[in-house]
UniProtKB/Swiss-Prot annotation:
Keyword Transferase appears in the UniProt entry: yes
Gene behind this protein: rlmL
Main location: cytoplasm
Reactions listed under catalytic activity: guanosine(2445) in 23S rRNA + S-adenosyl-L-methionine = N(2)-methylguanosine(2445) in 23S rRNA + S-adenosyl-L-homocysteine + H(+); guanosine(2069) in 23S rRNA + S-adenosyl-L-methionine = N(2)-methylguanosine(2069) in 23S rRNA + S-adenosyl-L-homocysteine + H(+)
Top class in the EC scheme: transferase
Keywords: Cytoplasm, Methyltransferase, RNA-binding, rRNA processing, S-adenosyl-L-methionine, Transferase
Organism of origin: Stenotrophomonas maltophilia (strain K279a)
Record protein name field: Ribosomal RNA large subunit methyltransferase K/L
Keyword Iron (UniProt): no
InterPro entries recorded: 23SrRNA_methyltr_KL (IPR017244), DNA_methylase_N6_adenine_CS (IPR002052), RlmKL-like_Mtase (IPR000241), RlmKL-like_Mtase_CS (IPR053943), RlmL_1st (IPR054170), SAM-dep_methyl-trfase (IPR019614), SAM-dependent_MTases_sf (IPR029063), THUMP_dom (IPR004114)
Molecular-function GO term, any one: rRNA (guanine-N7-)-methyltransferase activity
A GO cellular component annotation in the UniProt record: cytoplasm
Domain THUMP residues, every copy: 42-153
């Protein structure tokens, strides 16, 4: 019987070899799978033993299918009572390609309808639907007007081994992990007494899969347990029991002989804990040594030969950084130069960044992400000292030169004004369109962090060029500032967009303390688009701090309260900070406490600033108002700074004490101040030029600012 075994793209030839090793006489690689020929018992053996397959599809019919009615009629014509009992549950997976039936979910529903109607034709009850754990899973492949119906013998995706419990970020599917191990020739190296190493092990997928492979544990044993994978009426239960019994015998012998030659490390303690828990469930914890360590501190295992398998971060969500790949390549050359490596890199640029010489390179897909798998044997690169950094590309060198030029230009200004947080680069080279902000940590560690915000590239720029330039920019920044990858935050940001303070990027909850204008401040460089400190307002905050000693200060739309904190440190008699966000008010409270500025004189108010102004009757000597461009919070009326400016400024000016001053600023680039209307209640003059520091002179439209005083 001819049947189909599917797999991820890029694994087809490996799968064909695996099926041949399992005894299939005919196994021909095709797109995303293998066309196989054999008996049902052989197909069931694949369900139990294949480490690479996604599904094993046993055909039950094939027919012409020009349209939806033909699909329904063809399915209804089949004797479904010979495949499923009424009390069983059913699921249908559909994969369609054509111009008449284009929606897989619609096709799956029509198949379910046809099966149910045929069962009723036979005088039987309709089977129920269970999309997660059905008794029988039917598969449709519709291509070029021809429908192929199959039974999914495994009952679902075969990459699920049954041990995964504690998932870490972006886990690798087990069948792709098996492919990396096979490309690294791990079975051969293990048989020769070699070791296995993953220096960025995450939740342990590669190492656990390697341990199960070394112990000869069938992938289907834990996945299916004591039950058969399918209750299809054509399923050969006797053959399955025999296959299962053989697998259990081999598992017992293999686990007993498995030695602790597998090593995993990761800088994230949560990942290490997840890996240990997963290994325990899989029954291979005794064979794997997990340690928390940075890749730069990689220790050499005791085995002289072995395989390195690694899936370093490479998608935008995980902030791929070529410097991290360079550190990985250097560490491997130092620790295990004679080992073989199989590294799944995000693209050719990141593979190149490792500095390793790939003997072979394969195209693979991790889900929808196209990746480059490089195989190095041995890891050592003749004539290269891993301690020496790899030369920057021409583009990266251009960025590095501009960064050094800017740092030289800012040197005297930074020394004179004690500037430790500043913008070092703002799309100075148009093709490298990003902003690079520097944050120097205060206190004992004195680490330097980089906050890189990439502006959205025009749609006409090819994605490969965008990715290459991003990697070159990061490489240059890392080189110039000498910072490790964990101290670089990479984000993408569209030009000219107002608001957007609130989207979450990561969940590191890592704060560092920096200093500005004599105040200590907590910033979070990784979790949100903005950091808690708007660097462009530094001169304006300094200007206000110089005026507030012994005075009452009001901060509207206060965000994290930086201006309030600096006013308190400068000796303000009182500060009042108003914001709708409890998160930002807590941040403000923490910033005040960090500077020893507690007490009732520093008031935090959670409220809509517009509504609060209408009810407040206090008087203030200095008011700072920096509203968002737009706001549509569920807890307050919609806000538009252009539309609401008169109402806002009239209410704020009304709160000024005699001789008081209001500083109004916003970053809406198309903002137009209604000067004539404002002149009826306030003296107003623009002071933008005084509020732009040297580091923002290239982008003088980053914000605008005005000074307002009450008439009379």
């Amino acid at each position: 019987m001819k049947f189909f075994v599917s797999c991820a793209k890029g694994l087809e030839y490996l799968l064909a070899d695996e099926l041949s090793a399992l005894g299939l006489g005919k196994a021909t690689a095709t797109i995303a799978g293998v066309n196989a020929e054999g008996e049902l018992e052989q197909a069931l053996r694949i369900v139990m033993w294949s480490r690479l397959a996604s599904r094993v599809l046993w055909p039950i019919d094939e027919f012409e299918c020009p349209d939806e009615q033909a699909l329904y009629d063809g399915v209804r014509a089949l004797p479904w009572h010979e495949h499923i009992k009424p009390e069983m549950t059913l699921a249908v997976d559909a994969h369609v390609s054509g111009d008449k039936i284009t929606h897989a979910r619609f096709a799956a529903q029509r198949i379910k309808d046809a099966i149910v109607d045929r069962m009723r034709d036979e005088g039987l009850e309709r089977p129920s639907v269970n999309t997660d754990l059905p008794d029988v899973r039917v598969n449709l492949s519709l291509r070029k007007g021809r429908a192929s119906l199959s039974i999914d013998l495994g009952g679902g995706p075969l990459h699920r081994r049954g041990w995964r419990g504690a998932a870490h970020e972006a886990p690798l599917k087990e069948n792709l992990a098996a492919a990396l191990l096979l490309r690294a020739q791990w079975p051969r190296l293990h048989a020769a007494g070699g070791g296995l190493l993953d220096p960025m092990c995450g939740s342990g997928t590669l190492l656990i899969e390697g341990a199960l492979m070394a112990a000869d544990v069938a992938p289907g044993l834990m996945r299916h347990g004591s039950l058969p994978p399918s209750r299809w009426l054509g399923f050969d239960k006797s053959a399955w029991k025999t296959i299962q019994s053989e697998a259990r015998d081999r598992e017992a012998a293999g686990l007993a002989a498995l030695k602790p030659v597998i090593h995993g490390s990761d800088i994230d303690p949560t990942a290490i804990q997840a890996a240990r828990e997963n290994a325990e469930v899989a029954g291979v914890a005794h064979a794997i040594r997990f340690t928390r360590a940075d890749v730069a501190d990689l220790a050499a295992p005791e085995q002289e030969i072995g395989a390195v398998v690694c899936n370093p971060p490479y998608d935008e969500r995980l902030a791929a950084d070529p410097a991290l790949y360079r550190a990985l390549g250097n560490a491997l050359q130092k620790a295990v130069p004679q080992w073989r490596a199989s590294l799944l890199c995000g693209n050719d640029e990141l593979a190149f960044a490792t500095g390793l010489r790939a003997g072979k390179k394969y195209q693979m897909f991790n889900g929808a992400l196209e990746c480059a798998l490089i195989v190095c044997d041995p890891i050592a690169v003749p004539g290269r000292d891993p301690a020496q950094p790899r030369e920057l590309s021409e583009g990266a060198q251009m960025v590095a030169n501009r960064l050094r030029k800017n740092l030289k230009k800012f040197k005297s200004w930074r020394a004179r004004e004690d500037i430790t947080c500043f913008r070092a680069y703002d799309a100075d080279l148009p093709e490298y369109a990003a902003a690079i902000d520097v944050y120097e940590e205060d206190g004992g560690k004195r680490r330097t962090f980089l906050h890189v915000q990439e502006y959205a590239a025009p749609a006409a720029i090819p994605e490969n060029d965008v990715r290459r330039r991003r990697n070159e920019l990061l490489a240059a920044a890392r080189e110039v500032f000498g910072v490790p990858p964990e101290q670089v935050s990479m984000k993408s940001r569209e030009r000219g967009k107002g608001g957007s303070k609130y989207g979450r990027f990561e969940q590191r909850d890592e704060f560092i303390v920096v200093r500005e204008n004599n105040a200590l401040l907590q910033v979070n460089l990784f979790d949100y688009l903005d950091t808690g400190l708007f660097l462009d307002h530094r001169p304006l905050r300094r200007m206000m701090a110089e005026q507030v000693r012994g005075k009452r200060f009001l901060n509207l739309f206060c965000y994290t309260g930086v201006a309030s904190v600096q006013a308190a440190v400068a000796g303000a008699a009182s500060t009042t900070s108003v914001d709708l966000s409890a998160t930002y008010l807590q941040w403000c409270y923490d910033n005040l406490a960090l500077n020893g500025q507690g007490g009732n004189q520093h008031l935090l108010v959670q409220a809509d600033a517009m509504a609060w102004l209408e009810g407040d009757r206090g008087q203030y000597d200095v008011i700072f108002c920096d509203p968002p461009t737009f706001s549509n919070s569920a807890r307050a009326d919609d806000f538009d700074v252009q539309r609401e400016q008169l109402k806002l400024l009239r209410a704020a000016v009304a709160r000024l004490a005699p001789g008081g001053v209001l500083y109004f600023s916003n970053n809406f680039r198309r903002f137009k101040l209604e000067e004539n209307a404002i002149a009826e209640f306030a003296q107003c003059r623009e002071i933008t030029a005084r509020t732009i520091g040297p580091d923002f002179e290239r982008n003088a439209r980053i914000h605008r600012a005005w000074e307002l005083k009450r008439l009379g």
